[in-house]
Amino acid sequence: MVKLNSRTIQYYLLILYTFFSGVVFFEPSVGDILFIVLLPILIIHVKFKKTEFSLLALLLVPTLFSFFWGFVKFGFLNFKFVFIDIYLFLLFVFFKVCLDNFYEYDRNIIDTLMKTWLAVAYLNVFTGLFSYATGRFNIMGQSIVGFGIRLIGFFKDPNVFGPFACVCGLYVFEKFYQSNKNLIFAIFNFGFMSLGVFLSFSRAAWLNYFAGLLFIVLVYSFKNKNMYKWRTLLLVFLLVFFMVMLIFSDITIAGISFKEFFKGRLGIKSYDAQRFASQGKSLVMLDMSKIFGIGPGNYERITNYSAHNTYLRYMGERGFFGLITGGLLVAFITLRALKIKGKYFFLAASLIGLLVNSYFVDTLHWRHLWIVFAMIVSYSYRKEPYGES
């Protein structure tokens, strides 16, 4: 029987938040409400070290400076996005500290949290398959499938669900390389998560996934060449088989040809021109305010269209000051990811994929991005890899 004490309760609340970070079709989500309610308790009981204060400063200082400067110079006030930014920045550092604190309580806490994400990813994909099979794209007021036949799951956008499934897919893909135990189960998990990524029909998510998979393949090619060769050949065979089946299939979902829809996603879309034009306006914002930018959440005030590029959005809204501090943060997290040893190379692979994804989609407000950041920083400081003696 589990003995309930303060530490145990905090541990299960962390797992609960992780689960609900994959169910975000309404805002604030259950996880958001949980974090906000517990924030006063976290502030009182959680102790920050120099690393946490430094990370928070790199995020909060340019955000607050640009917010006040945007109001003083342009009259822009966007409290909503400032609060969202601050919430996610606090989530990042508190999640990191909580992981540090629970290392002795659960030496496999990364696995525990990833299995939690895997469970909610399965829920998303299974619900999507149910929608495809029954034609019920809307379940209890939530569009599970939309934008044609793109899988949204319990997210608000397939471009967010796809990258979330990528992290889970990379986790189980690394399991595929790590041992001969439960190999069939690992292949099934990988195939199912890959199906979720594919059905999102997000081109950025596909590129994200490819970059992450390639990184893991290269890492394990140096770790165990014999295992690498046959498992990589098996992977290539399965992927080629899947693609051939897709090309020659003639499935129709809700009157839409699956094959034709897939082909359509491979080309340049009409709205891509709007995206490129919007991205070019980031230079206009820099011209308006080079140092501090125009303020968080104000990009659309100038363009009337989302940036679809996290780096250009950050630069336009926070100026060169934000670009420098943001660059330092990304560089720090990347260096920590490259220090990872042991059995969690998927974290570095996920980071690479997310950084690639960020060039094509606004990722700043993705909860799973900040949780991955927290996992990387926390795990990379461990003297002994989680779950290894």
Walk through the language-model features, giving the residues of each.
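Long extracytoplasmic/lumenal interhelical loops at the membrane interface
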Residues: 138-140, 263-318
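Hydrophobic, aromatic-rich transmembrane alpha-helices
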Residues: 15-18, 34-47, 167-178, 320-340, ...
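Aromatic-anchored transmembrane helix interface
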Residues: 57-67, 76-100, 112, 116, ...
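Hydrophobic transmembrane alpha-helices and their immediate junctions
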Residues: 53, 182-186, 213-222, 231-232, ...
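N-terminal signal-anchor transmembrane segment
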Residues: 1-47, 61-73, 127, 354
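A juxtamembrane structural motif centered on a specific transmembrane helix
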Residues: 1-9, 178, 340-342, 375-389
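Alpha-helical transmembrane segments of multi-pass inner-membrane proteins
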Residues: 111-142, 153-223, 328-332, 336-339, ...
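A membrane-periplasm/extracellular boundary helix in multi-pass inner-membrane enzymes
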Residues: 220-266, 283-288
